[in-house]
Swiss-Prot record:
The chain crosses the membrane at residues 551-573, 586-608, 623-645, 759-778. Its EC number is 7.-.-.-. Its main location: membrane. The keyword RNA-binding does not apply. This is Putative ABC transporter ATP-binding protein BL0043. Gene3D superfamilies: P-loop containing nucleotide triphosphate hydrolases.
């Protein structure tokens, strides 16, 4: 129950919530709707106990958590019965094995190991992911990640589940799956509070709470989404200062052959990818893409054309390769096979070598030509903004095209006015709302005056008013002859704006068939690294053993010792069931650096017998020996470290490290928290790396010199990404802190561990082998 709640983000200058009173009944399904900025997400966090208000009274699950001030103990008790799922599932994942991630919350609650196993099985079955329990959730599709996040909450058996736009970035089938899960929870009596932009998601709600400008303006009963009230809800949000996205229509089998767009013209029935062959501006032929470590191709033998001036919608389920495809069209990702031609530029070509060979990528001159003709709006706008002001960011592309400052200013003004955001010109892009950031990112691409505009879900999470602006923009661009390829999950949107639709084929599932999970022990796959002896070692023994072996490498000073070190390293790789070439590929930048250091040593060492004289420089036999020894022993250290990281999950490392440094607790040092920070750092390094790559790609897509410029220009371009990377790090940290609170992690709590740490015979054998190896190195 909330009574007269007030909440401010700026110490009372403005109020995100102002005088809100609301009672949520046990077992009720409540939907929060309203324009962006109306306070829905803030109210959801207050209901979840993740944020305290600035005034009023809050009672959660019978606990009076806020009156004159926050009651920490009451908040702690209430949060044990409340789960929350956020819009971005990736920031809620704490480890790289699904079952370990689901176990994290129950471990924080201190549940017994056997009960944790049962909770994992039940929650994964409830969301349809029981057959992926050993998979890496960070590599799943968006829909699967969101279901994994829900499973993590269900494993805590919450009395109330709060969801903040959980389907905002999902396709129709994934959205339907999430709604099915909520229907099942509703039938079990779980209290559900659901923030949504989709009127059709409110159908099964008991009540709908309508919000505007931080206030509740009405509470209504749910009705069918095709009723006049649902239309009125959508219309009221459209007319607000910031509205919400309209619900997608669902054409039935008896839909007419043609559908009417907003402007009265008609859209052909959703079609295949064959366009007008007489004047194509985009030509894709037998395109295939496979991720480096994947067995199946995510895109397999795809061919289509797009005619000049055509507007085409690209549709498909989450994980079907839509974003990968448009990245290949923009020369930001290289295909595995096939050819691509965009605006007359051979982005990827096989020539006469045949279509099954890896295609030749565009050279620098061709890339520069491509950037002048093609604009790319990314899915996440925060990745595409990096300047100090919106105007400077929009000017980035035109300046890279070599335009004069007068023409650059004209381009900036025209682009901002076209999207009705001229008043934001002097604002920092990092201070804008998500919708404003998306419009600013689009303006930056439009300022480049592209002939081809590629947009990755430009209207996702936008309110109805901003969405309408995008549709008007697309019609304006079409009238100017601009070719548009737009990724969308919204069939109604495709019918309104597109000439036709290219459907992405559904990729083969990672694993198929029904699975009835009854196992309550940590799982291992039947083959590969996860089933290897090295993987199954107790992480404490493995951590100490690998560190000992790695430090021993620094004692290698003779060829015999080096040969023994190489033999041991190869044996470890074999025992880990890893491909040696894959291991070397993963660390090849470091290996290149070591080779360069070895070359330097060749000319620095003066002792020994000269074997080669190069003018004033000479290479001696001792110089060669030292160069090889130093480079190889450092390489062996790096390789062993790579094997350890590959075969040990962040959760296992956390548990092992926390146990090994637990004696520090007696000195008042929080060993468990130190271990968790280490684990989360390892978990989010790939995420931040991907975000850095996205910012670099955003610069490249607008002709940035980070891709094709001189060394000085590249260094200058690299410096421009520091601020957005720092902002992204803070954003991830803030989201992660909320996720940890939602999963009841607290400093100093007694956590149980689902993966029991026990010393087995294989651990003793491994420890003995390490000791023998160290003794042999010393003896030699």
């Amino acid at each position: 129950m909330l009574k007269d709640i007030r909440f401010s983000y700026d110490r009372g200058t403005s109020w995100a919530l102002d005088g809100v009173s609301l009672t949520v009944h046990a077992g009720e399904r409540l939907c929060l709707v309203g324009p962006n900025g109306s306070g829905k997400s803030t109210l959801a966090r207050l209901i979840a106990g993740l944020t305290a208000p600035d005034g009023g009274e809050v009672t959660l699950l019978g606990q009076r958590v806020y009156a004159a001030g926050p009651n920490a103990d009451a908040y702690r008790a209430a949060r044990h019965g409340i789960g929350m799922v956020f819009q971005n599932p990736e920031d809620q994942l704490v480890t790289t094995v699904l079952e370990d991630d689901v176990a994290f919350g129950p471990e924080n609650l201190g549940l017994e190991r056997e009960l944790i196993g049962e909770r994992i099985v039940d929650s994964l079955q409830a969301v349809g992911l029981a057959n992926l329990r050993q998979s890496d959730p960070t590599r799943m599709s968006g829909g699967q990640q969101q279901r994994a996040s829900i499973a993590g909450m269900l494993a805590m058996n919450p009395a109330m589940l709060v969801l903040d736009e959980p389907t905002a970035m999902l396709d129709e089938s994934a959205r339907a799956e999430v709604m099915r899960i909520l229907d099942d929870l509703q039938a079990r009596g779980t209290t559900i509070v659901h923030v949504t932009h989709h009127p059709d998601e409110t159908v099964h709600a008991d009540r709908i709470v309508h919000m505007e400008a931080g206030r509740i303006i009405g509470i209504t009963a749910a009705v069918d989404n095709r009723s006049p009230l649902a239309e009125a809800v959508s219309q009221s949000e459209t007319e607000g200062s910031i509205g919400t996205e309209a619900a997608p229509s669902r054409p039935t089998n008896d839909s007419p052959r043609q559908r009417e767009r907003e402007d009265g013209s008609e859209l052909p029935l959703l079609s295949d990818g064959i366009g007008d062959m007489t004047n194509p501006i985009i030509r894709v032929s037998h395109l295939t893409y496979r991720y480096p470590s994947a067995k199946r191709a995510v895109i397999d033998d795809l061919s289509f054309t797009i005619a000049r001036g055509e507007t085409v919608a690209l549709m498909g389920v989450n994980g079907s390769g839509k974003s990968t495809l448009v990245r290949m069209l923009c020369a930001l990702t290289a295909p595995t096979a096939g050819s691509i031609e965009v605006a007359g530029v051979p982005v990827a070509s096989t020539g006469k070598r045949g279509r099954n060979v890896r295609p030749k990528s565009a050279n620098r001159k061709q890339l520069a030509q491509l950037r002048r003709h093609v604009g790319y709006v990314m899915q996440h706008p925060e990745h595409q903004l990096f300047a100090d002001t919106v105007a400077e960011d929009v000017a980035y592309g035109p300046r890279n095209q070599g335009l004069g400052e007068t023409e650059v200013a004209d381009r900036v003004r025209e682009s901002l006015e076209l999207l009705h955001i001229g008043h934001l010109a002097d604002r920092s892009p990092f201070d804008l709302s998500g919708g404003q950031q998306r419009l600013a990112a689009i303006a930056g691409v439009l300022a480049c005056n592209p002939d081809v505009l590629i947009m990755d879900e430009p209207t996702a999470s936008l309110d109805a008013q901003a969405k309408k602006r995008i549709h008007e923009l697309l019609r304006t661009l079409k009238s100017r002859g601009v070719t548009v390829l737009i990724i969308t999950h919204d069939r109604e949107e495709a019918e309104q704006i597109a000439d036709r639709v290219v459907r992405m084929p559904i990729a083969a599932p990672a694993s198929g068939g029904p699975v009835t999970a009854t196992v309550t022990e940590p799982a291992v796959s039947s083959n590969g690294p996860a089933h290897s002896v090295i993987h199954r070692l107790d992480p404490r023994v493995k951590m100490v053993g690998f560190l000992a072996a790695m430090f021993t490498m620094f004692a290698v000073n003779t060829p015999t010792q080096l040969a023994l070190g190489i033999a041991i390293t190869l044996a470890v790789i074999a025992a880990a069931r890893l491909n040696p070439l894959r291991v070397l590929e993963s660390i090849h930048p470091i290996l290149i650096l070591l080779v360069l250091m070895g070359v330097v040593n060749l000319f620095v060492v003066r002792t020994g017998t000269p074997v080669v004289a190069l003018g004033p420089l000479s290479i001696t036999d001792q110089g060669v020996t030292i160069a090889v020894l130093y480079a190889c022993r450092f390489a062996l250290v790096i390789i062993l470290g790579a094997v350890f990281l590959t075969t040990t999950t962040p959760t296992a490392m956390t548990d092992a490290f926390a146990t090994l440094i637990s004696p520090l607790n007696r000195l008042g040092i929080h060993a468990q928290e130190i271990a968790l920070v280490m684990s989360l750092a390892l978990r989010f390094i790939p995420t931040l790396t991907d975000e850095t790559r996205a910012i670099v790609d955003a610069q490249s897509a607008r002709g940035g010199s980070i891709e094709t410029g001189s060394l000085a220009q590249r260094i200058k371009a690299m410096s421009a990404i520091i601020v957005p990377i720092f902002a992204g790090t803070l954003r991830h940290a803030d989201n992660l802190s909320l996720a940890l609170d939602a999963r009841c992690y607290e400093e100093g709590i007694r956590r149980t561990h689902w993966r029991a740490l026990t010393i087995a015979a294989r651990d003793l054998i491994f420890a003995a082998a390490v000791i023998i190896y160290i003794a042999a190195i010393i003896a030699l």
